[in-house]
Regions:
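Short hydrophobic alpha-helices at membrane interfaces in multi-pass membrane enzymes
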Residues: 160-181
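Short, Lys/Arg-rich, polar N-terminal cytosolic tail immediately upstream
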Residues: 1-6
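Alpha-helical transmembrane segments
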Residues: 8-22, 116-123, 222-228, 301
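Membrane-interface micro-motifs in multi-pass membrane enzymes
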Residues: 118-159, 264-270, 305-335
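Intrinsically disordered, polar/acidic, low-complexity terminal segments
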Residues: 7-68, 82-100, 108-113, 215, ...
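Transmembrane alpha-helical segments
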Residues: 97-108, 150-162, 195-203, 271-276, ...
Length: 548
């Protein structure tokens, strides 16, 4: 490789390094998600304990397959790295992101240069939804990013073998067959997209397939067989049927409609690019009408067909759209190159290099500010908060197995980027039965965890009857200052607040603000506790409440 070639790839390398660094930072600097705390434990074992060997990992996956899901491959990866150490997974995830981007460009039959890289990054950072759920959240990333990357490897080799007559090397054959199996084992909607691609490729190239030699036919059939075996293992899991018993199965356009609306601009730009390409003048070696037809058959039609089975599942989350979005981005990259080549051919006086650089800069200026700000935010606020929480628990309460632990609450919501598509909300709440609090307390082996602002008190009034009435906290003038907590975002269990009157109040307001309770409740009060970061103390009810 000569110096000129190296210089040409320096901008590509810099963009990839910055992007990968951002992905790593946004993952590593945040607290773990509720799923990651929970997946650290052996599933189906009571009393449960953290995974500490391969026997635990095997037992956990066997239990999960029987009771929850067929996604054994992705959950094996998740639980393996939760056992071995998440930092390894953060690094691998950043590299997987670059491989994902590279494969999109590779499948579009274009060079891995700054022009195509800027189009892909623009699409990922601005045109798709739930970026953090797909690429930053580790459990989500292995489910969606890693599985979609496996899909791209498989369809890349399959397309090249069937359509481009490419002869694969021994290493490529191994990758081809392995990716077929891992894609089949990966995740339901990814298998639907891949299966649709394979079926349409088989239909449109069946005559060509019949003319292949025996060795090539066996390679293609073997790959489809491995994909099919993985798919059957995935969907036939008893755990899938157990989940369907809980969630049900009925035809609904609502979730699909919402998911499509969430990527409306990606759909619009892809459609416009196809229309423009369709009407480009034909060249001797290239018919753009034929190219657009191939794009429709190879990418758009699989997109449409694969949506159908998802309309029968109630759990068609927006984060599940990544393989669908990826097909559209491939088409967008392909057509962008055709359109710009046409522009450069027509406008001979246009400086191609300068125009391309200007175009790339515009895309990156639009796409990256929130992403870069979010990366900075993760070092300024998320990492110090993560270290504070973990050190607080580790140093103060790790050996107090039954203690209620009070930790600092995240207090920088006002500084979150207005377009918060890159930062996951993994912040513990005041209510100890919120889902992240519950899983954190299990993970750190303490009785319960509550989060409180540094200048606030938690006031808890325990009662021996069920009561979810909203009681106001009044100031000295009788004005409502705040109200009792009666619900959490995801309380576990949902009834946990019926026997607890809980609210938070600034420390300097405790003496002049009291909660107003009915006289009928006075005889049912069993305990009154005030908590802050220094600990807790029991007080008289008259310190915090008045009765009427």
């Amino acid at each position: 490789m000569n110096i000129q070639t190296i210089k040409k790839y320096i901008p590509v390398a810099l963009i990839c390094i910055i992007f990968a660094f951002g992905i790593f930072s946004l993952s590593a600097n945040n607290l773990m998600s509720p799923d990651e705390y929970n997946y650290s434990f052996v599933v189906g074992l009571e009393p449960t304990h953290k995974i500490s060997n391969f026997s635990d990992l095997f037992f956990s996956q066997r239990s999960m397959y029987a009771t929850w899901t067929g996604r054994i491959l992705v959950h094996t990866v998740i639980q393996l790295f939760l056992w071995l150490g998440l930092p390894i997974l953060y690094v691998l995830n950043s590299l997987m992101m670059i491989l994902f981007v590279f494969l999109i460009i590779k499948i579009s039959k274009n060079k891995f240069n700054t022009f195509n890289l800027s189009i892909v990054l623009f699409s990922l950072l601005t045109l798709i939804q739930c970026f953090a759920d797909k690429f930053i959240w580790m459990a989500g990333s292995v489910n969606y990013l890693w599985s979609t990357t496996s899909m791209l490897v498989y369809i890349y080799y399959l397309y090249n073998v069937v359509v481009e007559y490419k002869k694969l090397s021994p290493i490529e054959i191994i990758l081809f067959l392995l990716s077929a199996l891992t894609t089949g084992l990966s995740q339901e909607n990814i298998t639907f997209v891949t299966g649709s691609f394979v079926i349409l490729l088989a239909i449109t190239n069946f005559k060509k397939f019949l003319k292949f030699d025996f060795k090539k036919k066996m390679l293609i059939v073997s790959s489809v067989f491995l994909f099919g075996c993985g798919f059957l293992f995935l969907i036939s899991a008893p755990g899938n049927f157990a989940r369907l018993d809980n969630t049900g199965m009925s035809f609904s356009l609502e979730q699909a409609k919402n998911n499509l609306f969430g990527i409306k601009y990606l759909i619009l730009l892809t459609t416009i690019s196809m229309i423009f390409t369709f009407f480009l003048p034909c060249k001797k070696t290239r018919s753009f009408k034929k190219i657009v037809l191939e794009e429709f058959l190879n990418f758009i039609l699989p997109f449409i067909i694969a949506l159908v089975p998802m309309m029968f599942l109630k759990e068609f989350y927006a984060r599940s759209m990544l393989p669908y979005e990826t097909l559209l981005i491939i088409v967008l990259v392909k057509n962008s190159n055709y359109i710009f080549d046409f522009i450069f051919d027509k406008l001979k006086n246009l400086n191609k290099a300068h125009f391309s650089i200007a175009f790339e800069c515009i895309l990156l200026i639009i796409a990256t500010p929130y992403f870069l700000y979010s990366t900075w935010f993760s070092y300024k606020y998320l990492l110090p908060y993560k270290q504070e929480v973990e050190n607080y628990i580790a140093h103060s309460f790790m050996h107090a197995k039954t203690e209620n632990v009070i930790i600092p609450k995240f207090e920088h919501f006002d500084k979150l980027p207005s377009k918060n598509n890159y930062i996951l909300h993994h912040y513990p709440e005041t209510i100890s039965t919120g889902i992240i609090n519950s899983y954190m307390s299990k993970y750190f082996e303490v009785g319960s965890i509550q989060a409180i602002e540094k200048d606030y008190y938690i006031v808890e009034i325990s009662i021996d009857i069920d009561d979810l009435n909203v009681y106001p906290v009044l100031d000295q003038d009788g004005n409502v200052y705040r109200e009792r907590f009666t619900s959490a975002a995801q309380p576990m269990p949902a009834t946990s607040l019926k026997n607890l009157i809980l609210y938070t109040i600034p420390k300097d307001c405790l003496e002049r603000c009291k909660i107003e309770l009915p006289n009928s409740l006075k005889s049912h009060i069993t305990d009154v506790v005030i908590k802050d970061l220094s600990g807790s103390k029991t007080v008289n009810i008259n310190t915090v409440a008045t009765f009427k």
